């Protein structure tokens, strides 16, 4: 019997807002605009694939 291995190709990213230093999780392939929950600055914008990040990546989670 052959087991199909499923690897996730996308990740969650912990990003830091450049304005208020708030850290929050963002999906790497976000399909909608992601805003900072504290100050409202745009952290990620969809591009049809991986999101365009406007914040610093602190950590990655699979």
Curated annotation (Swiss-Prot):
Q: Which Gene3D superfamilies match?
A: Zn-binding ribosomal proteins
Q: Which GO BP annotation is one of this protein's? A: translation
Q: Which domain of life is it from?
A: Archaea
So where does Zn(2+) get bound?
A: 17, 20, 36, 39
Q: Does the keyword Transferase apply?
A: no
Give a Gene Ontology cellular component term annotated to this protein.
ribonucleoprotein complex
SUPFAM superfamilies in the cross-refs: Zn-binding ribosomal proteins
Q: Which UniProt keywords apply?
A: Metal-binding, Ribonucleoprotein, Ribosomal protein, Zinc, Zinc-finger
GO MF term set: structural constituent of ribosome; zinc ion binding
Cofactors needed by this protein, per the record, are: Zn(2+)
Keyword Nucleotide-binding listed: no
Q: Where are the zinc fingers (C4-type)?
A: 17-39
Q: How many and how are cofactors bound here?
A: Binds 1 zinc ion per subunit.
Supply the Pfam families for this chain. Answer: Ribosomal_S27e (PF01667)
Assembly, in brief, is: Part of the 30S ribosomal subunit.
Similarity-based family: Belongs to the eukaryotic ribosomal protein eS27 family.
Record-linked PANTHER family: 40S RIBOSOMAL PROTEIN S27
- What protein name is recorded for this chain? Small ribosomal subunit protein eS27
């Amino acid at each position: 019997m052959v087991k199909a291995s499923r690897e996730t190709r996308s990740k969650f990213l912990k990003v830091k807002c450049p304005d208020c230093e708030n850290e929050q999780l963002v999906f790497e392939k976000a399909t909608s605009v992601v805003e900072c929950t504290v100050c409202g600055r745009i952290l990620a914008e969809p591009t049809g694939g991986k999101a365009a990040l406007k914040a610093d990546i602190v950590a990655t989670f699979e």
